[in-house]
Each structure stands twice: as C-alpha cells, then as structure tokens.
Amino acid sequence: MNEAEKITAEMFLPEMVQRYPATRAVLDLYGLHGCGGPQGPREQLGWFARLHDVPIEKLLRELNESASQAPSDVPEFAPSIGDTIYRPFFLAGIATVLTLGCMWGAINLLTIGLKQSFTAVNYSWVLAHAHAMVFGFVGFFIMGFAYQAFPRFKHTSLWRPKLAFTALPLMIAGILLQTVAHLLSPSSLQLEIAAATIQTISVIIFASTIVMTARQAKKPEVYDRFVYAALGWFLLAAVGNPVVFKLFELAGSREQLLFNLATFNIPYRDVQLLGIAVVMILGVSLRLLPHAYGLREPSRAWQGFLFWGVNGSILAGVVLFIAGMSSGNHWLLIVQWLTTFVLLAVAIGTPRQYRLFGPVPENERDRGLKFIRAAYVWFIIATAMLVFTPIYNFAIYMPITGSHVPFSHAFFGAYRHALTVGFIMMMIVGVSSKVVPTLSGVDVRRANSLWPTFLLLNLGNLTRVSSQIATDFFPSAYSVMGFSGFIEVVGLTLWGYELFANMRAGKKLERETSVHEQNGNGRFRITPQTKVADVLTHYPQLLQVFLRHGFGPVANPVLRKTMARVVTIEQACRREGVDLTELLAELQNVEISDQPANSEPVVPITRIATIQ
Ligand code: HEM
C-alpha cells in the first residue's frame, strides 16, 4: 500500500487536494468545478460523496488512484463563469430584499399601521413590492441556486453559462421598468408590456438553460420533475404578468377592480407563490435534505403524492377558483377549498418523512438547519390557516365584525405572509446560509451562527401574522403590526451582510489563487490578469523585463508596494502602450531561476536615477 491510499471518507477536501493536487480532477468530474475555491469546501469526503450522489467506495478508489499521479499531470485550477454564477444572482436577491422588496413592504406596512387601514397605502406600491419579491427575490435565488447546483448534482457543466448569465441583467431591467410602470399607472401599459417581455425572455433563458443542462447530463433524478414544474409555473406567471397588471392597475371602474381582484388575485398569487416557490423548494428539499444533512429520504409513494398532490391542487385550485368566482357557482369554490387540505397534508407529512425534527448528528448540523426546520413549521401554520380561511370568514369574522362580505383581508394577508416570509423566505435564508460559505471555501460550522437573524425573522413574522389578524377586532393591533416589518428587515440585513462577507472571502480566495495560480509543480503562472507586484514577488529578476518595456514606476520600491499591487499586466500594457502578447511571451519565456520569493528586486542605481 502506498501513502496515497490513506485517503479516507473522513478526510477534509482542502487537506486532500493540498496533499494530492491531482485528486481535484476526480472531484471536478463529480461536480466540484470551482465550488469552495481551488481546494474545495471545508467538508469531509463522505459528505461530498453523499451530496454529489457518488458511491463513497468508488470515489475513494478513484481518488487514491489519482493521488499517485505525477505532479506535472495535474490540471490547472481555472475557474470559469459557471463556477461562481450564483454570486451575482444572490447579490441581486439581497439587494432586492433591502430595497424594493422587504424594505418597501415594511414602509407600506408602517403606513397601513399608522393610518389603521389596509387601503391607506397606494395599491400600486403593494403590487410593485409583491412583484419585486416574487420575480426578484425568489426568482434571483432560484436562478442562482439552480445554475450553481443543478449541473453539479448531475455531474455535468452548465449549458452555455454566458447565455445563462444574461437572465440576470434582463430580469433586473424588467423589474425596474415594471416598478416604474406601477408608479406611473394608469398611463403605463406600454412600459409594462416592455418590462414583462424582457422578464419573460429572462425566464425562457433560465428555463432552457436548465432543461438543456439536464439533457446533456443524461442523469435523471427524482426531483427533476419538481424543477420542470416550477419552471412551467414561472413561465405561466411571466406570461400572465402583463394581463394581471391590466386587470389590477387599469380596471375601468371601482366595481370592475373589485371583481378583478376578487377573481384573479388569489389564483395569480397561487401560481407565483405555490407554483414557482413552493414547488421548487419541495424539489430542492428532496435533493438537499437527505444528501446534505443525512436525513431520511421520503418514500417513493410520498414523492409521487408530493408532486401530483401539490401541482394538482395548484392547477385545480386556480381553475376552480376563477370558474367559481366568475360564474357565482359556490360548489366550485367548495371543491377548490378541498384542494387546500392536500397542501396541509403535504406540509404535515413532508417533514415527518424526512424526520426533520429528529436527531441530526453533531457533524451534520450547521446554521442553516434551524431555518429549514422553522420554515417547515411555518409551512404547516400557513397551510392550516389556508384551510381555516372560510371557517374564519363565516364563523368568526362575519358574526363578530358584522361584515356582509365573507372575506377578511387581514386574515388572508396574514396567511400570505406566514407562507412568504415564514416558509419561502426562511427556507431561502436557511439554504443560502448553508451553501454560500460552502461555495466560498468558508467553514460553515465556524461561520456566524445567524441566531439574531433567526430570532428577528421569526419574531417579526409571528408579530405580523398575529397582529394582522387582530386588526379585525382591535384597532390598537395596527400599530404593533406597523412596526413588525422593520424587525424582519433588521434580521435580513444581518443575513445579507453575512452572505456578502462570505462571498467576498470566496472571491479573495480565488483572487489569491488566480495570482498564485499553481500547477502541479507549485509553480506560479503569469496571465494577463496577474498583478505586476505578484510577478515581481515571485520572480524578482523579471523586473528587468518590465523596465525594458518602459514600465518606469516599477523601479520605485514604494510604487511596487502600492500601485503594482493593484495593476494587472494587461492594464499596465494598456497604460504604457505596450504589446500585451509580446510582453507576456517574454515574461513567460524568460528562464526563471529559483530565486527566493520574498527577495527584493535589484534595480541598478543608475536606472533608478534616470527613471525618477
Ligand atoms: C419583511 C418582509 C415583508 C413585508 C414587511 C411585507 C409587507 C407587505 C405588505 C404591507 C403588503 C400589503 C398588505 C397586505 O395585503 O397584507 C404585502 C403584500 C404582499 N407581499 Fe409582502 N412583505 C414582506 C415579505 C414578502 C415576501 C418574502 C414575499 C414573497 C416571497 C411577499 C409577497 C407579497 C405578496 C404576493 C403580497 C400581496 C400583493 C397583492 O395584494 O396582490 N412579501 N407585503
């Protein structure tokens, strides 16, 4: 047995890659591809095997074989656009939360609270907030996560990463334009159509990238159909978006607006929240929870019920509700109500299937788990509220308040935020808090625990849901509700900052590696993006080459320590009008002696004098 065969399931990825650089190629084959930086995330091999669905014995055998490879055979670490594609999407999601999304929602809520009326806030503002949350916050996180994780889970690479990326600027532009269209309504239909078209193109790009990635992978898995269904709901929501804008923003009269809202608001939001977000979350849970936390895999029968039950109830619910409301046939609405029981059954049964609240081994636990557990508790609360809605309306709301309309806006809004903030947002916060440090090469178990975010988000949402229902009976509850949004925003700001810091750490790691790009011999590689100072630190003798090409400032030790640290070879060439290819060739071809890395380059005194 040689030394290489000491690679075991307990070994941490970075330690292994550091000792046996050739093993990274094997991890790449199973979907590592730049995740966690050049040496992979700080996780054990057993965890990697489970997450990437590779039999551990096979993985260990291949790793041990590759470990004995000659250092010169080791491929260079060259991260590509697809390797960190989640980053700009997640950043856009965080930015949305802190501006048009939750921040705007909190301002709306404060206005409602202070004026003690749900109609006190401009409805266009509510619509703009809701749209930014669904297409922006939920959309960006779903896109970023899917682009990053889907190809890796399937041991392939992302189909056309540059095209995939364009979904981001398109979606940002579409959402911003749509926000303006809401603010300018009713004179903004054309702007809305333009905004909706751009967003639809973005969704089509996203959906086709995922479908084509799956096709090239040829590795069908149980959760795939959830992803496809969520993509289908996303497309439907994108196509329906301008229609809904017209119905809600451009209704001819108040009666028409009330009819449109009563008939189409619930179905449209169901397509968005249940169709896009909940279906995708259920699919991601299926892939992530058993593989990342070692939880039990739901039975085949439950997986089937989960898929057909949820998608069936959304579809039937949407059709029956629209038909019932527009025809006045109450039987259709009763059947629609029955579909909500399926959602409640899913919410109760799914965490049981995973044994989500059972013991999880110490080494599998991390900061994301508490959010994921809380999310499933909120899912049960939200679906129980949904089932209870007609009972509340007829048996509690109407008799106590004397209302003639069997619909409490307060109760339904409370249900909606139990689902959106409690389940959808909590889940996104939990999963992102787990994957971002992992992908950035930060040890998730040593990272910030995010307890303040967890407590504030739950406290804020609990206050919001309970006080919003209480506004039906006690006007004083409005003021409590009014401030609850800011509790959530503070929690989310802490979370956003933490993720941002994790991503920055990952970026730094990559920069360092791209600067210290090494091949199997541990040798430094010079590329157009390499900083001038790094070249000189590694190969002080190359100073002469720079000077020959007219880079005067590098002769000055102070400028070498300052300016040269931030200027890349490419930038320096542009600045000095030097041919990049020629310089690179010369730098790379110079016979490099093994000079100590830290030695100061020696500049002839006369040369310094002439340059300065
Ligand atoms: C800090 C978090 C949030 C705050 C303070 C907030 C605030 C509000 C307010 C004040 C309303 C209007 C009142 C009402 O109808 O009940 C509203 C509506 C809405 N919000 Fe939020 N929200 C938050 C998070 C979210 C999230 C995470 C989502 C989606 C994932 C979301 C989606 C919606 C939707 C769909 C509506 C209904 C719009 C309609 O009437 O059609 N919100 N939100």
Q: At which residue positions do the language-model features occur?
A:
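A short, highly charged, low-complexity intrinsically disordered segment
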Residues: E510-N521, P596-Q612
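Compact, charge-rich alpha-helical regulatory domains located at protein termini
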Residues: N2-L59, Q518-Q595
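Short secondary-structure boundary/hinge segments and terminal tails
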Residues: Q44-L45, S66-S68, F150, L289, ...
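A helix-coil-helix interface module used to build multimeric assemblies
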Residues: W47, K162-P169, V603-A609
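Cytosolic juxtamembrane regions of integral membrane proteins
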Residues: L60-S80, S593-T606
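Hydrophobic alpha-helical transmembrane segments of multi-pass integral membrane proteins
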Residues: A70-N519
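Generic short alpha-helical segment signal, independent of protein family or function
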Residues: A49-R50, N64, S68, M143, ...
